[in-house]
Curated annotation (Swiss-Prot):
A biological process from GO: methionine biosynthetic process
Family: Belongs to the tetrahydrofolate dehydrogenase/cyclohydrolase family.
Claim: Coiled coil is one of the keywords in the record: no
Classification via NCBIfam families: PRK10792.1 (NF008058), PRK14186.1 (NF010783), PRK14188.1 (NF010785)
A GO MF label: methylenetetrahydrofolate dehydrogenase (NADP+) activity
Alphabetically ordered keywords of this record: Amino-acid biosynthesis, Histidine biosynthesis, Hydrolase, Methionine biosynthesis, Multifunctional enzyme, NADP, One-carbon metabolism, Oxidoreductase, Purine biosynthesis
Subunit structure: Homodimer.
Keyword Membrane: no
Domain of life: Bacteria
EC number from the UniProt entry: 1.5.1.5, 3.5.4.9
HAMAP family: THF_DHG_CYH (MF_01576)
Protein name, UniProt field: Bifunctional protein FolD 2
Gene Ontology CC: one annotated term: cytosol
């Protein structure tokens, strides 16, 4: 039976360390500030924004939630981003996706100052990630890397299969594994023989958004399974992209859903916001 990689416990440990660092910064007159921007009233987005704000407040960070109606124009949103870029009390800017159809999300994300891009989505920061330079790393992939490290998984020489190729998780997590000397295969909807690819993997990272798509008997004996997916089945049940119970019989370690990668995403957002505040305080932007 697999060891459960407890994302909640790892996140709590990291947040305790972050809280101590926030106090130290505050002693120098700097309080890390995060602005979250929500356009419209998507219920799931409202929950995510509230969770991010609550997490900031618990650490002693400054949190600002800015809501705009769904009919907000792209020009109005870009003007708001410009204001936040020039606000010295704000170190991180997060625009909650998805945005209404009249707004081009790429243009909005590119308008955020790279020094305040704590989501790691700006092309400047993506380019630095690709070339292996220090940068804000996207929060979910960063959380996955920290979980693997905490679980004692050394990726060097390992066969890693990433299922999913999104800009938010699949592509960046594959890059991060490559930088840690793994041999990486990215699978997607056009991949031939997905079960065969997964069966060859020492580490499986599932980020495709399809409930229990990765079957337990696809998992190699002793493999490590990181399940990024969060899918609602019925009214209350949450499941990942991996068939958890069956996979846990074969894997050496596995993340649960919920309680796995999810808590790490917000934790790494807090980490990035703290780093942005440190850079602003040192004038290194």
């Amino acid at each position: 039976m697999a060891t459960i990689i407890d994302g909640k416990a790892i996140a709590e440990k990291i947040r305790a360390d972050l809280a101590a660092q926030v106090k130290e910064l505050q002693s120098r007159g700097i309080t890390p500030g995060l602005a979250t921007v929500l356009v419209g009233s998507d219920p799931a987005s409202e929950v995510y924004v509230r969770m991010k704000g609550d997490a900031c407040n618990k650490l002693g960070m400054h949190s600002v939630k800015i809501t705009r109606p769904a009919e907000t124009t792209e020009e109005e949103l870009l003007a708001l981003i410009n204001e936040l870029n020039n606000d010295p009390a704000i170190h991180g800017i997060l625009v909650q996706l998805p945005l209404p159809p009249q707004i081009n999300a790429d243009r909005v994300l590119e308008a955020i100052s790279p020094a305040k891009d704590v989501d790691g989505f700006h092309p400047y920061n993506v380019g630095r990630l690709v070339t292996g330079k220090p940068t804000f790393q996207p929060c979910t992939p960063y959380g996955v890397m920290v979980m693997l490290q905490e679980a004692g998984v050394d990726l060097a020489g390992k066969e890693v299969v990433v299922v999913g190729r999104s800009n938010i998780v699949g592509k960046p997590v594959a890059l991060m594994c490559l930088q840690r000397n793994a041999t990486v295969t990215i699978c997607h909807s056009k991949t031939r023989d997905l079960p065969g690819r997964v069966r060859a993997a020492d580490v499986v990272i599932a980020a495709v958004g399809v409930p229990e798509m990765i079957k337990g008997d696809w998992i190699k004996e002793g493999a490590v399974v990181i399940d990024v997916g969060v899918n609602r089945v019925g009214e209350k049940k949450l499941v990942g992209d991996v068939e958890f119970a069956a996979a846990a019989e074969r894997a050496s370690a596995i993340t649960p859903v919920p309680g796995g990668v999810g808590p790490m995403t917000i934790t790494m957002l807090l980490h990035n916001t703290l780093e942005a505040a440190k850079m602003a305080g040192s004038g290194n932007r």
